[in-house]
Regions:
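Short acidic, glycine/proline-enriched helix-loop-strand junctions
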Residues: 189-222
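Glycine-rich phosphate-binding "P-loop"
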Residues: 34-40, 61-68
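Conserved Rossmann-like nucleotide-binding pocket used by diverse enzymes
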Residues: 18, 65, 181
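Conserved AdoMet/S-adenosylmethionine-binding subsite of the radical SAM
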Residues: 49-61, 70-196
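Flexible, glycine- and charge-enriched loops at secondary-structure boundaries
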Residues: 41-42, 128-132, 197-204
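Short catalytic helix/loop segments, enriched in acidic residues and glycine
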Residues: 46
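Canonical Radical SAM [4Fe-4S] cluster-binding loop centered on the CxxxCxxC motif
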Residues: 7-43
Length: 222
């Protein structure tokens, strides 16, 4: 749990709750301890609710992150409990299971949606067959829902090059995405220890200029 952040829900003071478990094995994952279904640092839900009760006058929102939170069967009920306390509800997801994502989406005020790559390149990142189809199907659900969102792509320059990143942005724009963020990978801790550390190459004004023309809202994060 992160008790206070201004980064994980735009414009909101938020608490982030990290849900255990993920079905993908993204090579640059910087939270590999959250992949297993059970973890060593689990917090009882009652303790979380007590913490939130004490922060009702300080926090605006609670973000459910992971791992992949939509794999948790109890997520929708937990989201409703948080909303009943007066908080806005954020969700970080890659839409791993489209049905589970669609169910959780109905309980969210805002979604930070991860798009790893072009559909055809997904397995290079996630190491899971069919992951691209699932992700983009969930993206369609998100865009049709009317729920506020940000789509974001984590860039590791050994897994995606500038031409593919631009093609990804163009495909997102053609799909109806209005808000897109590119964020450089965190290399301090990665699931694939053999993956080379890629410099955070950000001095690409032509590429970022093209993306700013594609989207009404574009953000570049180091």
């Amino acid at each position: 749990m992160v008790p206070l952040t201004t980064l994980d829900y735009p414009g909101m003071l938020a608490c982030v709750l990290f849900c255990q478990g993920c079905a993908w094995r993204c090579r640059y994952c910087h939270n590999p301890d959250l992949i297993a279904p059970r973890g060593s640092a689990e917090i009882d839900w009652r303790r979380v609710l007590l913490f939130l009760q004490r922060r009702q006058d300080l926090l605006d929102a609670v973000v459910f992150s992971g791992g992949e939170p939509t794999l948790q069967e109890g997520l929708p009920a937990a989201m409703d409990e948080v909303r009943a306390m007066g908080f806005r509800v954020g969700l970080h997801s890659a839409g791993i299971k489209p049905a589970g994502f669609a169910n959780a989406l109905r309980h969210a005020d805002w979604v930070g949606f991860d798009v790893k790559a072009l559909v055809e390149d997904y397995q290079l990142v996630t190491q899971v067959k069919g992951s691209g189809v699932a992700n983009w199907r969930s993206l369609e659900t998100l865009l049709a829902s009317g729920v506020d969102y940000e789509c974001r792509t984590t860039v590791h320059w050994h897994l995606i090059d500038t031409s593919r990143l631009l093609r990804l942005a163009q495909r997102l724009q053609a799909s109806g995405v209005k808000r897109f963020a590119v964020q450089m990978v965190r290399t301090a801790s990665m699931l694939d220890e053999q993956l080379p550390i890629a410099p955070a190459q950000m001095a690409l004004p032509e590429l970022w200029g093209c993306m700013r023309e594609l989207f009404p809202a574009f953000v570049l994060r180091g």
